[in-house]
Amino acid sequence: MTHRNIKIGLEIHFQLNTGKLFCRCPVETSGTEKYRFERHLHVSESEMGRIDAAAKYESERSRTFEYVVTDNSCLVECDEDPPKMPNEDAIATAISVARALNCDILDYITYMRKIVIDGSNTSGFQRTAIIGINGYIETSKGKVRISTVCLEEDAARKIEEKEGTVVYSLDRLGIPLIEISTEPDIIDEEHAVEVAKKIGYYVISTGKSRKAPDSVRQDVNFSMGFGRVEIKGVSKLSQIKEVLKYEIQRQDMLKKASDLIKLRGGFDRSRFYFIDVTDLLVNTSSKVVNSGLKTGRAYAALCTNLAGTLKSGEYRLGKELADLVRAYGLKGLLHSDELPGYGLKESDIQPIYDRLQKDELDGVIILLSPQEKIGIIEEEIANRIEKLISLDLSETRGPTEDSTVFLRPMPGKDRMYPETDIPVIAVSKDILQKSDKIKSVGFEDLVSSIITKYGISKQVAESLASDMKIQELEELSTYLDPRESARVLTQIIPYLEKKYAKKFDNNLIFVLVRLMSDRKFDRYQVEKALEILFSENKDPALIVSDERLIELTKDEICEIIDKLKKSGITITKANVVSVLKKNTDRIFDPSMAIECLG
């Protein structure tokens, strides 16, 4: 990164395994569905009598929320019972982590309600409390300040989104979540990854962090002088670099597009309004348009001075607007920089341009929308165009594999108001003594504890800690020898991921290893089973019965070697193992192969 004005901060969220925060339900679930119910959430005012922009936006989307009640949720998650007092183990863990991060611990824990009406909480708000403030960590590029350590409830897990309805599972709602927020002291994307790792060590070392694929999530706060962008829910450390690189390119593009539009005379909002052009498209052969006309009508609007900026060369304003309309349930939009296209011919679009009195430098947007949505969408698109051109880029965005997409406006203080069901909690001596028993340590101490606990080398322990694989090591070591578990995590799985260009959920790998352990299979059989999983995507229950896991006897190995020699293949002690692997699917003990050579 070469931009001088870049500022980066992180908000890192860690799920805890202590039991849910405001009820006595466990955090884990068998996945059993008990029943479902629906809710419609409406915006409310903050304690200052204002309505938050993000909450207003979600309210205008007018969606229905369906909730799946699971075996680890109760009436508290359904918002039919008041919350219980917060989980003391979770509080003690949060205090331990805050202390390790050099924070000042507050004398009182005061919960607040944060208005959230995207459906991720049945109540329409999330409960959160500050535990510690004014901390810091030392890094290779200087001190990074920790602004707050909070303890809050996690959101419901989105399962499905369909026309006008979002389906959530309550299995995740209410899981304790430690949120650690930094000041914008991070210099570049590599530094962001380093900071995220260092903070992660302090939480993982407590032994209280949950072992699940989505148990750690990063929100990346980014600015290069055009307002703060929050990239919410980055699940992988490697993804931090990619989304930051994309966001720099995106904001560079928007700056250039803004300069060009202003040079031309700017965007005239008074001329931006949708007119019905369905009559001009009734005879089109475009499948895209005809499909949209089955459930709505065609509308077009003039975007003064936007020609060439919607999609041409490096400009991509059209994508910015398409992300917005998708949030309102539309599939996207068509615009003049891509037309003719999508089956629309020049004879289809020229009458639209004529009706709008389009000039050479003007752009045109075409929407296929139900009539009842076009009013609010018109206002939101106009607002967004003006916002982008003025370079007010502050908003919440979501990560994709290598980019970001618009989620909602940036929320602010107007979404906060006091919690009325949970009393203020004094941080007593008992709570502090409980937190003293929970050890939160940095990288070096974590490596030392791994070596002591599992008897593995310092190099391997550092690799596991650096790759944040301590929880996986703990899980695998219940089924395998710790040294073999470390080998699987640091060598076997990375090798197979690279060889077969695929990744598997850790839970699936653990299921396979557990089944192998139940049958007393050795390390060679475990490694062969993992290769079958990666190469064939086979059910673990079937893999354990695969005949390729039957180990060759010494006589069988010697027989294969003799046949290979007779066929003219030169076999030595140096190459016998690699030659055998190419000529048999079954596993074998390498030492036996060497013995066959005398």
Curated annotation (Swiss-Prot):
Keywords, in A-Z order: ATP-binding, Ligase, Nucleotide-binding, Protein biosynthesis
Function: Allows the formation of correctly charged Gln-tRNA(Gln) through the transamidation of misacylated Glu-tRNA(Gln) in organisms which lack glutaminyl-tRNA synthetase. The reaction takes place in the presence of glutamine and ATP through an activated gamma-phospho-Glu-tRNA(Gln). The GatDE system is specific for glutamate and does not act on aspartate.
A cellular component term, taken from the record's GO annotations: cytoplasm
Pfam family, one: GatB_N
Matching PANTHER family: GLUTAMYL-TRNA GLN AMIDOTRANSFERASE SUBUNIT B MITOCHONDRIAL AND PROKARYOTIC PET112-RELATED, GLUTAMYL-TRNA(GLN) AMIDOTRANSFERASE SUBUNIT E
InterPro entries reported for this sequence: Asn/Gln-tRNA_amidoTrfase_suB/E (IPR017959), Asn/Gln-tRNA_Trfase_suB/E_cat (IPR006075), GAD-like_sf (IPR004115), GatE (IPR004414), Gln-tRNA_amidoTrfase_suB_CS (IPR017958), Gln_synth/guanido_kin_cat_dom (IPR014746)
Family: Belongs to the GatB/GatE family. GatE subfamily.
Organism, scientific name: Thermoplasma volcanium (strain ATCC 51530 / DSM 4299 / JCM 9571 / NBRC 15438 / GSS1)
Oligomeric form and interacting partners: Heterodimer of GatD and GatE.
Any single GO BP term: glutaminyl-tRNAGln biosynthesis via transamidation
GO MF: aminoacyl-tRNA ligase activity; ATP binding; glutaminyl-tRNA synthase (glutamine-hydrolyzing) activity
Enzymatic class: ligase
Protein name (Swiss-Prot/TrEMBL): Glutamyl-tRNA(Gln) amidotransferase subunit E
PROSITE patterns in the cross-refs: GATB
HAMAP family: GatE
Catalytic activity: L-glutamyl-tRNA(Gln) + L-glutamine + ATP + H2O = L-glutaminyl-tRNA(Gln) + L-glutamate + ADP + phosphate + H(+)
EC number: 6.3.5.-
Gene of this entry: gatE
